[in-house]
Amino acid sequence: MIKLGFHVSIAGSLPLAVSRAQEAGCDTFQIFTRSPRVWAAKPIEPSIAEAFIDALNISGIGPVVDHMPYLPNPAAEKPEIYARSIFTMTEELDRCDQLKIPYLVTHLGHHGKEDGHKKGQEKVIAAIGQALDESEGETMILLENTANEKNTVGGTFTDIGVISDALSNERRVGFCFDTCHAAAAGYDLKGHGAETVFGWFNDEAGSLDRLKVIHLNDMKGGVGSHLDRHEHLGLGYLGEETIHDVLTFPKISHCAFIMETPSDEIRTDKDNLAVARRLAV
């Protein structure tokens, strides 16, 4: 049976995220280990890390996925932003190791006008390579596809393949596939189907064996819109048939399926989870 869950809040304390995941009925979940909107991160006290790990072990939920905060840009043109981005990625890998979190999802950033795309790729490769070399533990960095907005790195499967192929520490580099981002970038999951689109990903980005997380999101925009706006499952362009197609595609059944859908007056997280469970059979 596939594992389904959400991005959950750590408000109050890290161990409370486990309680929230349990309350929502999650099999797996994603967090930020810190505020995603600032550079500075308060160190995780050993007692807090121990409480988080204990709560997780008791819950039976897993794997847990961490997401990089918003400010780092591993393709940054400005040297000070680039250096801080590498430091933050290294720090976040160490925080994952402290919390026994196996996966850290990262976007690949935006390159500057002067640098151009190829230079942006080279910076991302160097940044991730340095972070892996300088961090402790075995946490994997998962490269996430984007909606291919202007100047982004990682907006095409080929782009992700260039990054992953250049990183020699392959055992600690994997993938996160976002369904909304893929379709917004022009990969029509609705029109071509999961088997075809994930086949392209396998051929151009890397083996599906290295795909560890699916961000299962419907979308407010259409194919090729480059609009990164998530919608409730089945209520956006992709629709229930496409979500079912993704959830039942055998070659990705080993992945953790994380929803980053809205929680509002239309649907709660529990409502979206019920839809996902219905569409997974």
UniProtKB/Swiss-Prot annotation:
* MF GO annotations: deoxyribonuclease IV (phage-T4-induced) activity; DNA binding; DNA-(apurinic or apyrimidinic site) endonuclease activity; phosphoric diester hydrolase activity; zinc ion binding
Cofactor stoichiometry and binding remark:
Binds 3 Zn(2+) ions.
The EC designation for this entry is: 3.1.21.2
Keyword list (alphabetical) reads:
DNA damage, DNA repair, Endonuclease, Hydrolase, Metal-binding, Nuclease, Zinc
Q: A Pfam family in this protein? A: AP_endonuc_2
Binding site residues for Zn(2+) 1: H67, H107, E144
Q: Which reaction does it catalyse?
A: Endonucleolytic cleavage to 5'-phosphooligonucleotide end-products
Family, similarity comment: Belongs to the AP endonuclease 2 family.
HAMAP family, per database record: Nfo (MF_00152)
Instruction: Describe its function.
Output: Endonuclease IV plays a role in DNA repair. It cleaves phosphodiester bonds at apurinic or apyrimidinic (AP) sites, generating a 3'-hydroxyl group and a 5'-terminal sugar phosphate.
This one is known as: Probable endonuclease 4
Organism of derivation: Methanocorpusculum labreanum (strain ATCC 43576 / DSM 4855 / Z)
Q: Which gene encodes it?
A: nfo
